[in-house]
Amino acid sequence: MHDLLIRNATILDGLGGAGVVGDIAVDAERIVEVGEATSYGRTEIDASGWCVSPGFIDTHAHDDGAFLRYPGMEFKLAQGVTTVVSGNCGFSAIPRDPQADSVAASGGILAGLEGQFTDLEGYFAAVLERQPAINNVMLVGHNTVRSLVMGEEKRAPTEVEMRCMQQHVTDALEQGACGFSSGLIYRPGRYSETQEVIDLAHMASPFDALYTTHMRNEGDGLLEAVDESLQIARASGVHLHISHHKAAGRANWGKVRTSLAKVDEALAQGQRVTLDVYPYTAGSGRMIEYFNLENPSPELAEVIRIASCPAFREYEGRMLKDIAVEIGMSLPDAVQHVLMAPKGDRTICIQFLIDEADIETNLVHEDMMIGSDGIPDLRGQPHPRLFGTFPRVLGHYVRARGLLSLPEAVRRMTSLAAKTFGLSDRGVIAPGMWADMVVFDPHSIVDTATYDDPKQEPDGIGWVIVNGQVAYALGNHLAAGSGKMLRYRRCAYGDDD
């Protein structure tokens, strides 16, 4: 008798092939049989009429703090996500000074980091004590490392400081981080020259780990930023992963075709490059990074929505232009009012700056994965992508728009992501693989989270299995606590291309 048996499912194995009706047996956290079951299960799921695929892998998450604050990870589990990649945009839980203000250091992106850990080993131990619902693999962040060594200094590092930063990066990689991330739009990373990033990304090369980047510019300077990212990866000898690829601002719409052409040229020359995208026309991030406080842009302020604002909780979920009218201020004055208040620099905003056509251009690129980029501060009104990213791709862009076939979309969310991030024995339904799976209805799966009501779980997800345990069943979170902290190993499927 098997621990778990899923019967009569349309199996999408994650490799891009058509679905095949069959059964899946699980024992001791792993898939042991795929095809026609020859036994019974202690727990059985009749998946007639449902699809089963590998659990979705969120390649761009900021869940470092969420694993400590919300170990049930309901906002990810309910959309079929079984593994996330945290530590993105240059902000990671480690390395860390436990006495420092982690919220201030990340500008609110990581929320609070509880515990006395200082390195990846300690962080993983702290998370596992809380019995997380899903799996996590970590990047080590440039902004975090730089802040720990140099504070917010607007200058190049000294030789001693560089060696110290390199050691922090190496320590994290030795403990199992999957790569080095940068967020060059954010402070203090924005103060770095290209060579500094090369010198740090180079530490990932002996581990065959990744360099992931929130590029220096995603608007007017997008193409130059892509060139810089490719240069950094070439010079440091590592795989480049471009985060949340987009062209922000109406004047830049359509540029993604040119930036993707640059990526394709690099691929043709043998450089390893992958990307991810979120399926929304609005982004979200630290509001202070988008404005010149001395002269805030009224045009940008016009499209800003407040997601999380410790200084003015009553503003959360509202458009800044409406707040400005209410308090009798111009838009530039309202920007200063929010950002210059105590803790105002921790404000997270939503910006409506992306073209729908560009999202579709991104999604059809064969090396494009899906990353939510959700910022999990549930006290505010977060971007709906935190709850809806993966069902939105399958419901809107696959079923309604027909941009991708269902098997290909699943491949992007599973085996491609697992291979890219070195997640050994995950991302494919086959005997011997870890039993991370999602059972969903391809005819009804869709996001329900909106900007006005973002904390809504999607429709069409039936069951989610994490390391062989049923963690979510028909709308119920089962507190299985079966998530693992994953250590990087290149390459999951025995090759490197």
Q: Residues of each region from the PLM?
A:
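Histidine-rich, glycine-flanked metal-binding segment
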Residues: M1-G55, Y70
